[in-house]
Amino acid sequence: MHRLALTAQDNLAVAPMLADLAGRYPDIEDPELIRSAPVLAAKGLPPHLLAFLDDFRLREPSALCVISGLDVDQDRLGPTPEHWRDSQIGSRSLNLEIFFLLCGAALGDVFGWATQQDGRIMHDVLPIKGHEHYELGSNSLQHLSWHTEDSFHPCRGDYVALMCLKNPYEAETMVCDAGDLDWPNLDVDALFEPVFTQMPDNSHLPQNTAESTGDPTKDRLRARSFELIKSWNENPVRRAVLYGDRQNPYMALDPYHMKMDDWSERSLEAFQALCEEIEAKMQDVVLHPGDIAFIDNFRAVHGRRSFRARYDGSDRWLKRLNITRNLRGSRAWRPAPDDRVIY
């Protein structure tokens, strides 16, 4: 794990900037704030924090990077929302969200999905009543199966980032680093073949977002996206599970959303052996309030252990960002060069 602990001096140094930005922008989704984030990060974040993030980005010392020690005032934060739709109405965590955004901007460009949480850039991960046994980040009584974030999509992010605001029962985030796997004893060549069917995960389905954005143009684009999601579910795209350097490969897999019934015997055996190796090397990481985790989405899979939600305002509450190092790579999927939402 690549880890940095913020000091009291670090918190004091960034507090005036965060307060100023929180007073200047209405919410974390403000396009000008998001557009300015890389410049604001370069000017306002402590140099040693920027160097730490740059080291994680370029050297790949680990698939998991954790920044701890960000001050979180629980009284100011207020109760955990009942639903992600309620989370940004008069947000009392805007200063923390801005810090999280700036750290993410030091690694790449943040982006969102039209088919996920109403196209928001910053997501909320919290238990939702009725989702307890649903394969979704808002479940609680069952594990969230380990996966590569958005493994089905060619524009998936380089990093998925999580900022912990609350975690009273210390629910564990599961992470497996590709660097820990015993590649010489796996059938790497078979896993590099583009024969593995991967389907969209449940978070991109239309029932998990609002019926309308209020913008007819965006609604048309989003309807097209949902049709594409439907087509990928009915006719899954075949992709390789591994790519990059065959000696130390990158991964893209989500076993829960992969249809295996027509794979060759070799492909199935290679995939099952990889999954068994991942299970054996999986680590549990408990995020505490003020912890920010950056998971390398090329080099790790992640999930979450089950827990019993309370629905009393004290439940586990994380913020989430998707980050890419190649925003141009998704240009065909976005309405404009500076639009951060993939349709």
From Swiss-Prot:
InterPro entries: Alpha-KG_dependent_hydroxylase (IPR053447), Arginine_beta-hydroxylase (IPR023966), Clavaminate_syn-like (IPR014503), TauD-like_sf (IPR042098), TauD/TfdA-like (IPR003819). It catalyses: L-ornithine + 2-oxoglutarate + O2 = (3S)-3-hydroxy-L-ornithine + succinate + CO2; L-arginine + 2-oxoglutarate + O2 = (2S,3S)-hydroxyarginine + succinate + CO2. 2-oxoglutarate binds at R316. Being totally regio- and stereoselective, this enzyme is of interest for biocatalytic purposes to produce chiral scaffolds that are of synthetic value in the preparation of more complex functionalized chiral molecules such as natural products and analogs. Binds 1 Fe(2+) ion per subunit. One of its GO terms (molecular function) is 2-oxoglutarate-dependent dioxygenase activity. The keyword Ion transport does not apply. Alpha-ketoglutarate-dependent dioxygenase that in vitro catalyzes the regio- and stereoselective hydroxylation of L-ornithine and L-arginine, leading to (3S)-3-hydroxy-L-ornithine and (3S)-3-hydroxy-L-arginine, respectively. Cannot use L-lysine, D-ornithine, or D-arginine as substrate. This is L-ornithine/L-arginine 3-hydroxylase.
